[in-house]
Every structure is written in structure tokens, then in C-alpha cells.
């Protein structure tokens, strides 16, 4: 008998369309899986069984009437940074512990229109600030491949639930690697679209010039199906770009013969584990065998400055975005004083966790009088240089290939007390956000039983190209089909 929780979107869709299974059966199987595994994995902040079963019933009625789309009846999860009308949205923070949004995020409405089934909201680093999901105010999500290890972050819950077969797909957000890094750590396909490709309306903001919403899926084909559903212009988001939405499934034929791929030397730094480099070299061999040409002598010399640029710009934007949480209109409120200023001060002191407060302070400092020109303006100038280097590279290459992370999934607690060590986890992913590029992380093997991810980077709005490369790689390998023993 078919194990329903192991199905991809495409496989589930075919069975639903042929009426061999129902959405109710598929949804119940995933809810049972969640009930079984959640005590150990802890991927979900909120599970919505009644909502899920109601939506599954509606999907089955639509299918019976011949109204079926690629995501109709497919159980999915959302990172708890996306607003869901009537369903708690916490950002894994005490500040929003009991916040129930009065509206849906744009992507939530689009998925609802497609008939997808919402299983629940996933755990994350508080306000999307972190690389391990240990910064959640509630609990730490565990890596399905080894529950002593972190799943990555900040979208760790969204990655873990797909890896653990608790959901067919999920959505996360990526500000400096928060989709791709946990995708690498959990051995799933994680995609950050071009900046402006997917509306941020209803995404609780961390850093508005860097944030982007994207999917976690079991393979590149599924990723394309989700992108077809969520991409597109939205006039409610000032950063949404009025581009024609491509058919992301177009060209997914496994053929990348003649593609020119560059390998930037700077991404193989001294802190890169040699065994990860070995796996990436193996992956490059696969791509070469598929007919792509590989140039290993690409140089992006400003790459080493990306981490410093990010940790000036992102905290600066966070300082502004998070100033709205003062305990007055919504969210946590310290009310044990009659002094308004003390109430606001205590609200923020008690409502935010240590990492969020650290980044707010860094950002406030960088924006302050006397330091704005020295730090913030200079960082913006270097950001431009990083973007220009990518643009120059893409005049020669169809895509760039790098490791997703310089390290393997690490033990829970290992880096928690060393912010710099934690920040270094994102050295391969941060430059892509700075330049607003599309990038995908796909499974590329294992080292000591722990996953390794391959990152494919594309030029702005050439999202289809990297999807084609990812799909071709997965046609030639089986790493994405491996699942953890749970």
C-alpha cells in the first residue's frame, strides 16, 4: 500500500485526480504523522486539525466536480511569520504569543485559492533572527536526521516538517539564508526566489530589503509547482515587481547540455569543511556529466565583506521594523506600571529575546547620528559592489554553483553562546540576499550521516534557469529521495 506521507506534490496530485485517494485520507495521514513525531521533532508552533480536515473536505468536493489544480487537497505548513486570519501567528516570540491576525498574507490567500490544506504553523528563530531555531521563545526544533542536531534556521520548523514527512510542502522566509540553510541541514529542496518575485504582504518584516518568501519541497518539480501558485505582482507590496510570472515547470526536461556554470573560489573558504568540498566536487562532476561546462576559476572578490554588510543592514532595518512592538496596540504588554515610558521599556525588554535585542541594538547604533555615514552608508556602497560583481559574472555564466553552508548540522547548544560562530553559518547564503538573486539548495549527499546541500544561484528573475539545473541534477541523483528513519 502507498505510504501517503512519503508522496511528493506531483504524486499526490495524480492520485487525487484519479480518485485513488482523497484529500481527507491524505490529510489524516499527515495529522497522524504529526501527532506521532512532534514530541521529538517539535517542528510545529500550532497544529490546526479542524481547519485542515475542513479544507480537505472542501478540496474533495472540488475534485469530485472536476475542479482540481496542482495543489488542490495537498497538506502543507506555513512558517509562523506569515499572517493567517483567525490562526495565531507568533513569530516564535513572547511579543506575539497571543496575536491572531485579522487578515491573511498574500501567499496564504493564493494557496487557499489553489485549494491547498493548512496543517499548521511552524517553529522558527524569533522574528526570523537565527540559524538554528534555538532562538525560538518556546522550544528548539530538532533535525529529523539526528535529533541531537539543529535543523538550521530561521525556518527550521518548515524544513524539518517536510524532511520528517509531516507535510508535503511548506513555506518559509529567507533574509540571509533562512530557507536554504535549513534545507541543506534537513536534506530537502529549499528555494529563495528573486527579490520581488513573491509578495511580502502579510509577512512579518525582519529586513524589508532582504526578506523573501519561498517553498520547502521534496524535489525541484514540486518547488516549481508551488512557485507557480505563489509568484506574481501584488500592489499591496511596494517591493513586488510587475514581472510576467513564468511557468516554472517549463523546461524541466533534465537537459542542461551547453549550460555554462561558474564556481566562485571565495565560497570555498578556510572555514569550509574539506568533506563538504568533496561532496560539492562530486556534484559538479554530475553536472559536467549532464553536459554543462564548469569554470572553477570564477572570482567574486567582495564576497568576504558580505557578512559584515549584512550585519549592518539587516539589524538596521530590523531596528526600524520592530519599533512598532511597544505594547500599545497589540502583542505583549507590560502593565504593572502607570508610567507609559516604563511600560514600553519593560514591554520590549521582556517581550523580545536576547538575539532580537542584540540585533536591534546593533541596528540602532549603525543608524545613530555620527555613525550612519561610517557604517550604514558604507555598507550600502559595498552592497552595490557585491551586486555588480554578480551581474558581471552572469554576463558569462547561466548560473553559479556553491556549497549552501560551510558546515554540517551542529549539535543543539554548540554555537548558542557564540554569536559570531552562529553568524558564520550563513557565509554562503547572505551574498545572494544582498544582491536580490534567486537561489536554491538541493540535497547533494551525506557526511557522517548528516546532509550536505548544493546551492545554485541565478541572475535576477532567471528563476526558471536554476529550477532547470536543480531538476536535472535530481534526475541524475537520488539524494533527494533519501528520508530519515523516524
Curated annotation (Swiss-Prot):
EC class of the enzyme, as a word: ligase
GO molecular function, one term: ATP binding
Signal peptide: none
Coiled coil (residue ranges): none
Record has Protein biosynthesis as a keyword: yes
Record EC number: 6.3.5.7
PROSITE patterns: AMIDASES (PS00571)
Keywords: ATP-binding, Ligase, Nucleotide-binding, Protein biosynthesis
Gene Ontology CC terms, in alphabetical order: glutamyl-tRNA(Gln) amidotransferase complex
Reaction it catalyzes: L-glutamyl-tRNA(Gln) + L-glutamine + ATP + H2O = L-glutaminyl-tRNA(Gln) + L-glutamate + ADP + phosphate + H(+)
Active site: 79 (charge relay system), 154 (charge relay system), 178 (acyl-ester intermediate)
GO annotation terms (biological process): translation
NCBIfam families in alphabetical order: gatA
Record text on subunit structure and interactions: Heterotrimer of A, B and C subunits.
Family the UniProt entry places it in: Belongs to the amidase family. GatA subfamily.
Described purpose of this protein according to its UniProt entry: Allows the formation of correctly charged Gln-tRNA(Gln) through the transamidation of misacylated Glu-tRNA(Gln) in organisms which lack glutaminyl-tRNA synthetase. The reaction takes place in the presence of glutamine and ATP through an activated gamma-phospho-Glu-tRNA(Gln).
Protein name: Glutamyl-tRNA(Gln) amidotransferase subunit A
Gene from which this protein is expressed: gatA
Amino acid at each position: 500500500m502507498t505510504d501517503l506521507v512519503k508522496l511528493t506534490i506531483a504524486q499526490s496530485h495524480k492520485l487525487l485526480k484519479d480518485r485513488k485517494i482523497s484529500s481527507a485520507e491524505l490529510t489524516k495521514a499527515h495529522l497522524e504523522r504529526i501527532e506521532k513525531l512532534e514530541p521529538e521533532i517539535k517542528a510545529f508552533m500550532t497544529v490546526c486539525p479542524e481547519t485542515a480536515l475542513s479544507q480537505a473536505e472542501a478540496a474533495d468536493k472540488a475534485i469530485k466536480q472536476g475542479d482540481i489544480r496542482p495543489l488542490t487537497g495537498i497538506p502543507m505548513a506555513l512558517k509562523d511569520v506569515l499572517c493567517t486570519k483567525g490562526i495565531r501567528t507568533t513569530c516564535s516570540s513572547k511579543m506575539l504569543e497571543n496575536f491572531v491576525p485579522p487578515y491573511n498574507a498574500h501567499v496564504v490567500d493564493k494557496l487557499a485559492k489553489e485549494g491547498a490544506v493548512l496543517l499548521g504553523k511552524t517553529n522558527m528563530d524569533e522574528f526570523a533572527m537565527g540559524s538554528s531555531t534555538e532562538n525560538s521563545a518556546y522550544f528548539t526544533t530538532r533535525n529529523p536526521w539526528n535529533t541531537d542536531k539543529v535543523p538550521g534556521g530561521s525556518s527550521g520548523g518548515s524544513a524539518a516538517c517536510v524532511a520528517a514527512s509531516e507535510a508535503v510542502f511548506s513555506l518559509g522566509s529567507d533574509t540571509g539564508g533562512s530557507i536554504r540553510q535549513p534545507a541543506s541541514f534537513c536534506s530537502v529542496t529549499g528555494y529563495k526566489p528573486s527579490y520581488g518575485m513573491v509578495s511580502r504582504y502579510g509577512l512579518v518584516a525582519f529586513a524589508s530589503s532582504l526578506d523573501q518568501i519561498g517553498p520547502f519541497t521534496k524535489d525541484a518539480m514540486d518547488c516549481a509547482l508551488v512557485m507557480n501558485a505563489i509568484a506574481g505582482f501584488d500592489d499591496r507590496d511596494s517591493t513586488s515587481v510587475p514581472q510576467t510570472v513564468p511557468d516554472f515547470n517549463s523546461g524541466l526536461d533534465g537537459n542542461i547540455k551547453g549550460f555554462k556554470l561558474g564556481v566562485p573560489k571565495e565560497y570555498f573558504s578556510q572555514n569550509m569543511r574539506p568533506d563538504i568540498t568533496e561532496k560539492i566536487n562530486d556534484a559538479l562532476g554530475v553536472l559536467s556529466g549532464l553536459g554543462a561546462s564548469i569554470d572553477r576559476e570564477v572570482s567574486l572578490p567582495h564576497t568576504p565583506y558580505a557578512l559584515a554588510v549584512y550585519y549592518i543592514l539587516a539589524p538596521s532595518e530590523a531596528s526600524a521594523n520592530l519599533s512598532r512592538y511597544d505594547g500599545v496596540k497589540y502583542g505583549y504588554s507590560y502593565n504593572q506600571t502607570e508610567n507609559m515610558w516604563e511600560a514600553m521599556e519593560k514591554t520590549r525588554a521582556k517581550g523580545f529575546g536576547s538575539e532580537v535585542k542584540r540585533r536591534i541594538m546593533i541596528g540602532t547604533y549603525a543608524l545613530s547620528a555620527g555613525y550612519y555615514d561610517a557604517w550604514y552608508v558604507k555598507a550600502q556602497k559595498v552592497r552595490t559592489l557585491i551586486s555588480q560583481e554578480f551581474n558581471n559574472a552572469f554576463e558569462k555564466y547561466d548560473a553559479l554553483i556553491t556549497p549552501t553552508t560551510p558546515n554540517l548540522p551542529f549539535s543543539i547548544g554548540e554555537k548558542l553562546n557564540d554569536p559570531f560562530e552562529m553568524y558564520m553559518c550563513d557565509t554562503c547564503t547572505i551574498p545572494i540576499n544582498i544582491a536580490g538573486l534567486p537561489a536554491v539548495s538541493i540535497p547533494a549527499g551525506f557526511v557522517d550521516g548528516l546532509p550536505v546541500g548544493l546551492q545554485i544561484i541565478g541572475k535576477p528573475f532567471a528563476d526558471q534557469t536554476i529550477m532547470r539545473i536543480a531538476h536535472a541534477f535530481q534526475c541524475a541523483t537520488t539524494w533527494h529521495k533519501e528520508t530519515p528513519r523516524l
